[in-house]
Amino acid sequence: MGAVRWSERLLLFVASAVVLVAVDQVVKATVSTPLWAFHHRSYGWVALSIAVLAGALLLTLVPSRAVAVAAGVMSAGAIGNLISARVYGNRVPNPLVIGNYERGFAFNLADVFFLAGNLLLMAALVVMVVRRRDRLAQPRPWERALLRQLHVG
């Protein structure tokens, strides 16, 4: 398996994010949202979302296509809700409703992309670490002693 260039991983990240953001924005523009299903977002939420995007962009440095795509999917969720918050005055529409106001919940595709991206990202990182476990640092003496006490090592 050849090395994956950073530019290729960046392209996978950007392409997956752009496509999914477009889908999210089309759904938000075409499916009506009940007034109660708009969720207010604070400036703190905006700052945290931008920090998450910066971290996701750094994940393109990990030499894995799967990590890059998963980070792009997760970023699509953050970007989709950031765009919506900007367009709708810090209120994000949630046109997908299960149930009603009293017994139900509302969400949007950006929420789904963010959660799915997180799950994919965890799986991709675990697979990468397991495949490269021979490159991990050996446990130090105190760590080996702790593992023996825990009956793990």
Give the positions of each predicted feature.
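Alpha-helical transmembrane bundles and membrane-interface segments of multipass inner-membrane proteins
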Residues: 1-153
